């Protein structure tokens, strides 16, 4: 499908939500966990689509809240691009996601939706008496600062 339709796809492998272990950590008859088996499938499915950058068109969703599994999955899926949710508000950290990148600091896209969108709540500057324009400015500035902090924290742990 990726080749035929010139599209990319991301497959849920090890997600960041707290209940993910109910399914993803189940042990199969082979002794593997479900997420490990899915990782092998993803790497195999993408084998025919590896481009000049060394990555396939079949990516994996690997949650920032599972840093040890993420590091092991990077070794298991060296040609797979990772989409990494769960950074920030869900507890994922720059140090924790560092192992999900390749040796050159590539191969992963880290997402922090709530941490950036909701940064204004942590600012302590919001007041119900603010004008709408001031509130929008606060939201924008807080989001900008949260994004910069995330960028700086990731840069500090990547090559």
Residue ranges and their predicted role:
Residues 26-33, 60-64, 134, 141:
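A short glycine-/small-residue-rich loop at the edge of a beta-strand within enzyme catalytic domains
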Residues 39, 43, 70, 94, ...:
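Generic structural signal for well-ordered alpha-helices
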Residues 4-58:
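Conserved anion-binding
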Residues 5-6, 28-33, 79-82, 101-104, ...:
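Short, low-complexity, polar/charged sequence segments that are solvent-exposed and flexible
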Residues 60, 64-111, 115-125:
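A C-terminal functional module that forms or caps the active site or interfaces directly
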């Amino acid at each position: 499908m990726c080749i035929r339709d010139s599209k990319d796809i991301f497959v849920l492998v090890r997600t960041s939500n707290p209940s993910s272990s109910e399914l993803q950590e189940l042990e199969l008859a082979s002794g593997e966990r479900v997420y490990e088996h899915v990782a092998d499938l993803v790497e195999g499915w993408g084998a025919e689509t590896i481009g000049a950058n060394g990555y396939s068109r079949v990516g994996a969703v690997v949650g920032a809240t599972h840093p040890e599994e993420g590091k092991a999955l990077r070794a298991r899926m060296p040609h797979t691009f990772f989409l990494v949710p769960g950074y920030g508000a869900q507890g994922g950290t720059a140090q924790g996601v560092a192992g999900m990148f390749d040796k050159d600091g590539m191969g992963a896209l880290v997402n922090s939706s709530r941490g950036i969108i909701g940064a204004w709540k942590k600012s302590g500057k919001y007041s119900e008496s603010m004008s709408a324009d001031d509130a929008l400015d606060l939201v924008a500035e807080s989001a900008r600062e949260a994004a910069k902090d995330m960028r700086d924290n990731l840069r500090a742990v990547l090559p």
